[in-house]
Every structure is written in structure tokens, then in C-alpha cells.
């Protein structure tokens, strides 16, 4: 059994059904090993076509099975610190504010960021935190 836990980004969340590892991830989600931030939940709500769809998504799996990690002042401070370190290297306009907050949440909570977003790789190169890229099948052309 693994002690590893993940923090899912929206980039991975929307591609879960396209993953050849969907069954593995579903099992991990059911076991409470895949967490989500309030920020990612807001992104999901923003993408919903209407309130009814948003409410349904939040009350059904996979979202309903994911423990929520909320922002703290320490997380916000770390996100700002990482943004400043990225600015020192001229890369501060790459990662979005949600990406910085999600990465800081994962780093300070001991979670691995599950993503399909190169900006998390850039952040991890700086912070040394764990990330995992979701394996998925790209959409057919």
C-alpha cells in the first residue's frame, strides 16, 4: 500500500476519462488519495454550462470523493515566493495564479501534483516538489 497522495489540477481532471489508467485513478479517488483545491473547484464551476450542471458535478464522483485542500496564508505566501523566484528567471508570466496556488498547496501539504500542464514542471524544477503527468489519449483529429 502506498502513502502517496495527489492533488489534481483541472488539466488532469478533465482528461481522466481519456486516461488508459482511468481504473487505477478511479480506485485512488474512491480511497480518498486524490485531493482537490478550492481553486480547482472554482475552475470547474467556471467551466460549467449552468448552475444545475455545476451542482451535479460537485455532488457526484469523482469530485464528491476528493478531499478539499483550502488555501491558507502560508500557501498564498509560498505561491508569491515561487512567483518571485520565477520572475528572477524571467518565467513569472508562464504559470497562472491558480497553478501557483495549486503547486504551493501540494508542496506544503506533501501532495504530488497530478497534471497535464507544463507549467507545473517549470514550478517543480524550481521547488523540487513532486509532480506526475497524467497519461491520456489525445483527442482524435
From Swiss-Prot:
Q: Which portions of this protein are annotated as coiled-coil regions?
A: none
User: What InterPro entries does the record tag this protein with?
Assistant: PIN-like_dom_sf, PIN_dom, Type_II_TA_system_RNase, VapC_family
Q: Which residues form the PINc domain?
A: 7-129
Gene Ontology molecular function terms on file = magnesium ion binding; RNA endonuclease activity; RNA nuclease activity
Question: What GO terms describe the biological role, i.e. biological process, of this protein?
Answer: negative regulation of translation
Keyword Hydrolase attributed: yes
| Names of the cofactor(s) | Mg(2+)
Q: What does this protein do?
A: Toxic component of a type II toxin-antitoxin (TA) system. Acts as an RNase. Upon expression in M.smegmatis inhibits translation, growth and colony formation. All its toxic effects are neutralized by coexpression with cognate antitoxin VapB2.
Q: How does it assemble?
A: Probably active as a homodimer, which binds to a VapB2 antitoxin homodimer, which then oligomerizes further to a hetero-octamer. When in complex with antitoxin VapB2 the toxin activity is inhibited; 1 VapB2 may suffice to inhibit toxin.
Please state what the protein is called.
Answer: Ribonuclease VapC2
Amino acid at each position: 500500500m502506498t502513502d502517496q497522495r495527489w492533488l489534481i489540477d483541472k488539466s488532469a481532471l478533465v482528461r481522466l476519462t481519456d486516461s488508459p489508467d482511468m481504473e487505477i485513478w478511479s480506485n485512488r479517488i474512491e480511497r480518498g488519495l486524490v485531493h482537490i483545491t478550492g481553486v480547482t473547484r472554482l475552475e470547474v464551476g467556471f467551466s460549467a454550462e449552468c448552475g444545475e450542471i455545476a451542482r451535479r458535478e460537485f455532488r457526484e464522483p469523482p469530485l464528491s470523493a476528493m478531499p478539499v485542500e483550502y488555501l491558507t496564508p502560508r500557501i498564498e505566501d509560498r505561491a508569491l515566493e515561487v512567483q518571485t523566484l520565477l520572475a528572477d528567471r524571467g518565467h513569472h508570466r508562464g504559470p497562472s495564479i491558480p497553478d501557483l496556488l495549486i503547486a504551493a498547496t501540494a508542496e506544503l501539504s506533501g501532495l504530488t501534483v497530478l497534471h497535464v500542464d507544463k507549467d507545473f514542471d517549470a514550478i517543480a524544477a524550481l521547488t523540487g516538489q513532486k509532480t506526475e503527468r497524467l497519461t491520456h489519449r489525445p483527442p482524435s483529429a
